[in-house]
Amino acid sequence: MKKMLFTLTSAALLCAAAAAMAEAPVATGETAWLRGKPVATYTCEGKTVIPVSALSEYGFEVENGDALKITVSDAEITAEGAPATAGDKLAEVKAETTATLDGQPVVAYTLEDGDAVIALDDCFAYNAEKLSGIDLIVIGTSDLEKSKDFFVSHMELNVVAEGTLDAASVKALYGQEGEAKYVMVMNNVNSTKLMLIEFSEKTGKTTREGFHAWDYGYFDVAWRCNDIDAMYEELTGAGYSFECEPFSYTTSWSGNAVAECVAYGPDGVPTTMILKTTQEFDTKFYNMVDAVLVVDDMASAVDWYTNVMGMDLVYDAPVEKGLVDRVLGIEGTDITVRMGYFYGSYANGQSTLIEILDYSEPGVSMTEQGGSVPGNGGIFAQAFETKDLDKLLARCEAYGYKTASERTTMTLESVGEIDTVLVSGVNGTLYQFYQAK
């Protein structure tokens, strides 16, 4: 995780000799997420602001002087709320201040007690654009019809698009030769689609082949299931294998009594099925619960998902040892796991949740080792729509993340004409960003 969160440079705090203002910042009683950290919010001069001094309580180091600098420390990131009672007041505003944030002008106010507050909107403006959520989970397949049959016949997903990418587009974005056929499937709940893609050039390998559960990259996709035992019988009868048979437990993170199992779909794609004790639907499956990514540590995930993609870390805690070891692939070991969740803006609808797993055992990047890449069977990318691809790529570059493909224009059925590129994100894992033309 980068040490510098943001800096009010030497041009900072050039006071605008404004007349003293009587209004004091008033607590809203609400918590905001600023680059993965919860902070109490206040209203001041019609703006939502955060107090500079409060940041030190959440892992920030604050230096006051002719230049106000705020950096993030190595303090453990948690999802505990920031304390603030609605209606509480800070000291009165002394003057409006002109400051710079990442080289851009922002609104700040100095207070009578020497503290300062910064407009939250300005802080987010120089954060990343808050991306909505996962639009596409891109899954390589050795047999498109077999993969399509699995998700349509067994999981009752709907085909919403079918098409072929020309050889030039495939070469530019994926680095593969020849055309590629694809099918997009989704349920009636989530806005996230699965994009099943079969390249003309195939390796015969799968993305997770030869790797451990704790190696970095895409882990699985989890679904809420109506009858796990019935699905276990159905899929084993169809020739599919399981990482673990159905078992029951009570989650330590939500308190729900559930049953769970993990099936290996076409090309070995792990498909987790979760059954709550009370159901609210009659179909085989309901929503796509989450898409899981393994990282080297939670700070790396925050650096990518929050600092670059603008998303909020809303949960971060250890998983009770032994509770779901068989699902996590660590049964019989002393390996422990930390789990986190990220939310986007969900402007595109109910996008699936992003779940992060941080194992105590060091791993390797499946992408950098040639596993989770185009041409192999399995999940190799997630795609996110952005309103400004240029700005997003500049932010990736600023945080040390490089493009992993040519930038190209293509048309995807159900999506439209897009400007798109692959980026090597956290631990080298591939992400596809695109902007509608």
Residue ranges of each PLM-predicted region?
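Vicinal oxygen chelate
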Residues: D115, F124-K130, E162, A222-W223, ...
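An N-terminus-focused feature that recognizes amino-terminal "leader" regions
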Residues: A128-T141, E145-H154, N158-E198, H212, ...
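Amphipathic alpha-helical segments
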Residues: V49-G59, E145-N158, M231-G237, D297-L313, ...
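Short, charged/polar, Gly/Pro-enriched secondary-structure boundary elements
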Residues: E57, D74-E80, A125, T192, ...
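Bacterial N-terminal signal peptides
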Residues: T9-A16
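Primary recognition of N-terminal secretory signal peptides and signal-anchoring hydrophobic helices
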Residues: K2-L8, M21-A125
